[in-house]
């Protein structure tokens, strides 16, 4: 299929494929950040049920290190805030990639005289909401 395309169209198709790969990477990063965010929020919520005088430990690599309640809570709050920003940034990046994909797909279809089967259908495959 690609061998029959004009060089400009072949270049656009390669750009589409690159964007599709980028979209998949961004979606995977976003999913990982959302999972981490959910876990951190759950841990922060669990701190509400713990006595502030309880002995607490945090994981540092493969070790458990004793820590203070306030320090653990502050660290988790900071992590949650950071992850919320990360997820928001990835959502915006996902939107930009989707827009670029649709624009490029439209250009390719126009270049090929409106042939519907020119590029990958259904967007970059980022999935998710």
From Swiss-Prot:
Disulfide bond residue pairs: none
InterPro entries recorded: PFD_beta-like, PfdB, Prefoldin
Protein task: Molecular chaperone capable of stabilizing a range of proteins. Seems to fulfill an ATP-independent, HSP70-like function in archaeal de novo protein folding.
Location of this chain's protein in the cell: Cytoplasm
Domain of life, source organism: Archaea
A Pfam family annotated for this UniProt entry: Prefoldin_2
Homology family: Belongs to the prefoldin subunit beta family.
Keyword Chaperone: yes
Species this chain originates from: Haloarcula marismortui (strain ATCC 43049 / DSM 3752 / JCM 8966 / VKM B-1809)
GO molecular function: protein folding chaperone; unfolded protein binding
A GO CC term assigned to this protein in UniProt: prefoldin complex
Composition bias, Low complexity: 19-35
Region Disordered, residue ranges: 19-52
Keywords (A to Z) from UniProt: Chaperone, Cytoplasm
Subunit relationships: Heterohexamer of two alpha and four beta subunits.
Record protein name field: Prefoldin subunit beta
């Amino acid at each position: 299929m690609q061998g029959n395309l004009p060089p400009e169209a072949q270049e656009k198709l390669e750009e589409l494929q690159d964007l599709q790969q980028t979209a998949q990477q961004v979606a995977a990063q976003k999913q990982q950040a959302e999972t981490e965010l959910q876990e951190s929020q759950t841990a922060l919520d669990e701190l509400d049920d713990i006595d502030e005088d309880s002995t607490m430990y945090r994981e540092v690599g493969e070790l458990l290190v004793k820590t203070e309640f306030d320090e653990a809570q502050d660290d988790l709050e900071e992590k949650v805030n950071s992850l919320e920003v990360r997820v928001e940034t990835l959502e915006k990046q996902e939107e930009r990639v989707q827009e670029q994909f649709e624009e490029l797909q439209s250009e390719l279809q126009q270049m090929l005289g409106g042939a519907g089967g020119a590029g990958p259908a259904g967007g970059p495959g980022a999935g998710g909401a």
